[in-house]
Amino acid sequence: MFVPTLDAKIVGEVINEYRKRKGISQEVLSGLADIGRTHLSAIERGKRKPTLETLYRIATALDVNMSDIVIEIEKRIKL
């Protein structure tokens, strides 16, 4: 079974796009998700991969299901 590598850059792009659609800054999102702004910035730039807990916090702060973010990531990995 093929399991694609989770590309940190794709994860970051997806989170960044969801944040911008919501119309909030990294500062606001990091506060809502209870993570550091520099940590969020590193995730969005593809420098760090979020843990499941962090991804859940980000999704909750964005008022979206974590599965929606994961589905979008999967779509881009398969392209």
Regions found by a protein language model. Give the residues of each.
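The alpha-helix within a helix-turn-helix
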Residues: 19, 30, 59
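Helix-turn-helix DNA-binding elements, focusing on the entry/boundary residues of the two helices
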Residues: 15, 26, 37, 52-55
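Short alpha-helical DNA-recognition segment
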Residues: 23-42
